[in-house]
């Protein structure tokens, strides 16, 4: 698929999540899609499991993309996630698309942390 269509698929996915329109969110995935969370060692296989996880989610985040990069059938999103608890999370999502829908999503996320004092003399501070 053209890169602009792949980007639009991921943008609709984010829109669905942010609007709590899970039908729109799930429509962007293939039924046999896989979601992987390497940090927690989890893999969600297939639409039935994905719908169950998101249906049971105690508090879906609002996703604010900071950057979206597209290369062929791969879309990478750097984002800030707000779970409504006052703590922003930083995340990177790697979406692999097939025929205009997500076939695989790999997600990494963390909360901001204090910079180490030992390297302060060599770095510049940036806004998270």
Residue ranges and their predicted role:
Residues 2-28:
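Short acidic-aromatic low-complexity motifs
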Residues 22-73:
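A solvent-exposed, acidic/Ser-Thr-rich amphipathic alpha-helical stretch
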Residues 1-5, 51-128:
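A beta-strand edge to alpha-helix "cap/lid" segment located at domain peripheries
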Residues 10, 16-18, 33, 38, ...:
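Small-side-chain structural scaffolding
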């Amino acid at each position: 698929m053209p890169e602009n269509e792949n980007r639009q698929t991921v943008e609709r996915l984010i829109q669905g999540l942010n609007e709590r329109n899970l039908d729109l969110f799930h429509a962007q995935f293939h039924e046999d899609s896989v979601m992987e969370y390497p940090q927690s060692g989890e893999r969600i296989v297939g639409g039935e499991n994905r719908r169950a996880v998101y249906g049971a989610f105690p508090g879906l985040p609002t996703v604010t993309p900071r950057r979206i990069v597209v290369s062929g059938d791969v879309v990478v999103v750097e984002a800030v996630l707000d779970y409504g608890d006052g703590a922003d999370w930083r995340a990177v999502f790697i979406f692999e698309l097939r025929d205009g829908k997500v076939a695989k999503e790999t997600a990494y996320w963390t909360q901001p942390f204090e910079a180490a004092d030992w390297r302060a003399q060599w770095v510049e501070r940036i806004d998270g």
